[in-house]
Amino acid sequence: MTFKRALAFMLLAVTVLASFAACKTEEKPVEETTLDISGYTIVKPDITSNDITETISNFKKYLLSYTGAELKVSSDWYNPTQTLDESGYEILVGNTNRTVSADAAKELEATEDENSFIIKVTDNKIVILGKNDDTTRRALKYFLVNYAKTVEENSKTVNLKKGHSEIKTVTSDSIIFNNFTEFETILRSTVTAPESKWAIGTYEYPTMIQLRHNGKHNGTLLSTLESGDAGYRIMKSTDDGVTWKQIASVKDYLNNGYVTTWMPFLYELPVDIGDYKEGTIILAATSRNKSSDFDISTITLYVSTNQGRSWKTICNVDKAGGLSWGVWEPFLIYEESTERLYCFYSDDSDPKHDQKLVYKYTTDLKTWSELKECVACDDPALRPGMISIAKMSNGEYAMAFEMVGISGAPIYIKKTKNLDDWGPVSDYGQPVKTAEGITFGSAPWCNWTPAGGECGTLIVVGKHPVPYANTEEGAKMLISFDYGKTYVAIDNPIPYAIYSDSRCGYSPHLSFSEDGSILYYMNNPEYGVKYSCEYIELVKIKITGMDD
């Protein structure tokens, strides 16, 4: 009995130890935190807007860039005589005919907010659905930023797991484009305005710079504008545009008997030029003779070496006679490769052309080159004018100008890679318009920033819609993400009305922060009774691309 009892105890002990050993080595299954999407297809509704189709194409491109997964795109069409096969692995964008899309749509309908979207994952489907095209676009961007951009490169996965479901409400009032770039208005302020809304006066043609070459003063904003014959007001902001104060008034003391009247343009020297150090502020403008027939006009330069507090007149770039024979609308730009400062402007003085676009350049701010043409039309009645130029990252300069003499004074852009070579002067480039034909005319401005996409963002603004008619809406703002090959239109961030007695929208201005992420947009909407005068308004817009 003793031996049998001992053997029984030994067997029991072995069994218990084996049980403990089994408990110790048993492991729970690892929960998957990523989803392999390499075998998925992106599926969209058979009837889809062009905008969403383009957005899905960009979505596919970014998925490849972030995850390494190159997916096909197809529509949800199927032969109605056959049973719909829902067994495939699919990313469903929008309200497709798949069962899980319908289920997700019902969940989304339960939310009252129209700015909502849903992302839902089942065994073989990922649903990305918004209540409208705008929220679907935001849902796709949210998916990319939060679930695709966060994985290991070339992993062909996203940071999602089966069973995931979330509904989000968009809280931003930003504009989102098909390439997922967003424009968000972050500030509106008044730069300067009349003392009374019953006033009659001129508040137009604003330009602005953000100081970048003035040491501790960098970031300061300086602005100027047309304000009659009283001189060019210099407005200053040290809080990035929230508040403004006048610090100077610039007058012409070089040309005896001339008044400072029209078209001021501010520029900060990026390098030393002649006797003038990097950071010197230049104001270029048109002065005119006081005589009743305005018989002489000049392109005159003024400089400030103390951040705009005081000024002196240094030279005339050009001089010509009369309202019908004058020189107007100067624009300054420095070309690093040639170390030249260029002054582009409109010239009425050639009897062979009603008006043409010309330029001179200098390397010392004392002597200027001979006058050269960049646009001089074969039709002598045409009047190209109001130049602005933006340098883009592809090495091209884009020059925007109006073409008075064609109905509506439409805006054109001509390009070059060399400021001293614009090709045939009779070639005036391409019109600025969307694929739908949306365009504008008169008083253009263009500028470019690296923010917003692979090719950066080119922005063009003008005064009035084309075809032109008295309207309660000013011109749209046109945006290009491909160096000016194509454009999309958005509502003007500074709304204004256009009537025959209104000067609103003449002339808008675009500039950027040093890193390009902030757009400073200035214009002159109506202020007085019956549009007797305007005021200068600033809007700051934050530009955010997928990789910004």
Language-model-detected regions and their locations in the chain:
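Bacterial N-terminal signal peptides that target proteins for export
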Residues: 1-10
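Bacterial N-terminal signal peptides
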Residues: 10-18
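Sec-dependent signal peptide cleavage junction
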Residues: 17-33
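Secreted/extracellular small peptides and ectodomain modules produced from precursors
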Residues: 21, 108, 342-343
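Solvent-exposed alpha-helical segments and adjacent loops
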Residues: 29-178
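Asp-box/BNR beta-propeller blade signature and adjacent active/binding-site loops
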Residues: 177-548
